[in-house]
């Protein structure tokens, strides 16, 4: 993966998402993605950030977290960082097309519980690009600090699909999609408005999540659930320690409306189709930080 030390740009407010998404859509046809392309070397920093408790409560309700808790859900800082990530990924110097970009994985490290009423410094940068067997993958890093201490960080990978000669690394063990399903703990019947409710709470109003008509424009037969909603919903059910490490991989889209089965065993969790579990939508694991 290509890496470089980023320069710092300090923001005075949260970027508005709508114009960023529009700019990214307009620039997408001009992109020619490749793993050796240059990428933005800027680290965006937003100091003095406070959480909007009304939006937080809407997010908690949409994802199944208990409302009114003193601490932020483990996935919520991703929502806080999303506008900064979109500012970087919609810019002219980001080489991958925003339209069609697929969120493939997220890794989260939370070093302590994050009070909902605290003041934070938010920072986001693109760590690098890497070849993928289906195209080019970008890694975007989000960090949360309070009092100068790093308390939460994530690494998200986003895939731009294109023709490539890259060979996949040799795989060890059984692919996740071919493993025996984890013990089923719950079956969830998902309404058609899950994407709209999560989009309103998170700000991520990608048209593939909002309505069947807009989803069909991008090749989906129905609206699909946000990947980050699926992992948040699973973690709301599973629970996480105050200091935790989370890793999740997004395997296949969840069509809305639909039925899914939540499975879990020890620190592992997954989401499978309600068709007997043949289709794996999400796999992940959660454990303590630091690891025992």
Residue map of PLM features:
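A conserved acidic, glycine/proline-rich C-terminal tail/linker
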Residues: 234-262
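HotDog/MaoC-like acyl-thioester-processing domains
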Residues: 1-30, 34-38, 83-86, 104-190, ...
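Hot-dog-fold acyl-thioester-processing enzymes
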Residues: 2-105, 168-241
């Amino acid at each position: 993966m290509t890496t470089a030390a980023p320069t710092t740009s300090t923001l005075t407010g949260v970027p508005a998402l709508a114009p960023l998404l529009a700019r990214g859509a307009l620039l997408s046809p001009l992109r020619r993605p490749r793993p050796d392309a240059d990428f933005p070397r800027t680290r965006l920093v937003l100091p003095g950030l406070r959480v909007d408790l009304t939006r937080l409560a809407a997010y908690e309700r949409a994802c199944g977290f208990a409302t009114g808790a003193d601490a932020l859900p483990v996935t919520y800082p991703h929502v806080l960082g999303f506008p900064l990530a979109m500012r970087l990924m919609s810019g002219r110097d980001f080489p991958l097309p925003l339209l069609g970009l697929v969120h493939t994985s997220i890794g989260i490290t939370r070093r302590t519980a994050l009070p909902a009423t605290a003041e934070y410094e938010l920072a986001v940068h693109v760590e690098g690009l890497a070849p993928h067997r289906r195209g080019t993958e970008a890694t975007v890093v989000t960090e949360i600090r309070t009092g100068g201490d790093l308390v939460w960080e994530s690494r998200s990978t986003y895939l731009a699909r294109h023709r490539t000669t890259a060979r996949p690394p040799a795989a060890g063990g059984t692919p996740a999609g071919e493993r025996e399903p984890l013990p089923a703990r719950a079956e969830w019947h998902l309404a058609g408005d899950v994407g709209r409710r999560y989009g309103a709470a998170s700000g991520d109003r990608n048209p593939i999540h909002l309505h069947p008509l807009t989803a069909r424009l991008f090749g989906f037969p129905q609206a699909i659930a946000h990947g980050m909603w699926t992992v948040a919903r699973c973690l709301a059910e599973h629970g996480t320690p105050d200091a935790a490490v989370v890793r999740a991989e997004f395997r296949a889209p969840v069509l809305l409306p639909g039925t899914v089965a939540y499975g879990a065993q020890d620190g592992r969790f997954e989401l499978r189709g309600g068709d007997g579990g043949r289709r794996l939508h999400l796999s992940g694991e959660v454990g303590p930080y630091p690891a025992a």
